[in-house]
Amino acid sequence: MAQRTLVATFFLIFFLLTNLVCSKEIIVGGKTSSWKIPSSPSESLNKWAESLRFRVGDTLVWKYDEEKDSVLQVTKDAYINCNTTNPAANYSNGDTKVKLERSGPYFFISGSKSNCVEGEKLHIVVMSSRGGHTGGFFTGSSPSPAPSPALLGAPTVAPASGGSASSLTRQVGVLGFVGLLAIVLL
């Protein structure tokens, strides 16, 4: 009986640690100097974002000169119009980290309206969370009411097919293997 309790405890700890390891920090644009006005449409941060899969639990990281710029999280309408007056969140420390707490679209613009107008902005879509729970709006607190449709701005996009296996699939596979190993050893 004690061995089964030990195995169950091991599974629980392993599953929780695997969940933590699967989240990652992503530097916006792929390098520290990317939060700037793009020199051409092909260097748009949205082009960069289209090549990635963002997941609930990932963290976006911006590096920039806090004396010259900032990052605003805004609604879809504010994103389209580069409206900097009423952001949902304002980051200005030069080393901004935003944890993606829910699935769906996120919109970010430069705190400088002129920079935004010239293309310094980012729109990403976060894939559904591993297990279906989307968490709170900006924090990982207990479930809260659904975010305002105006802030979401668009429907959630389904994950593209043919990509790498999802984190949940990897976790189930690893847990299955460890479970089989535990049964064989007992």
From Swiss-Prot:
Protein topology in the membrane: Lipid-anchor; GPI-anchor
Designated gene of the protein: ENODL13
UniProt-recorded name of the protein: Early nodulin-like protein 13
Any one Gene Ontology cellular component term annotated for this protein: side of membrane
Glycosylation sites per record: 83, 90
Family under the similarity heading: Belongs to the early nodulin-like (ENODL) family.
Signal peptide: 1-23
Role according to the record: May act as a carbohydrate transporter. Required, together with ENODL11, ENODL12, ENODL13, ENODL14 and ENODL15, for male-female communication and pollen tube reception and burst at the synergid cell surface of the female gametophyte.
Residue ranges constituting the Phytocyanin domain according to the UniProt record: 24-128
Paired cysteines (S-S): 82-116
Deleted gene: phenotype: No visible phenotype. Plants lacking ENODL11, ENODL12, ENODL13, ENODL14 and ENODL15 have a reduced seed set due to aborted ovules as a result of pollen tubes failling to rupture and release their sperm cell cargo.
Organism: Arabidopsis thaliana
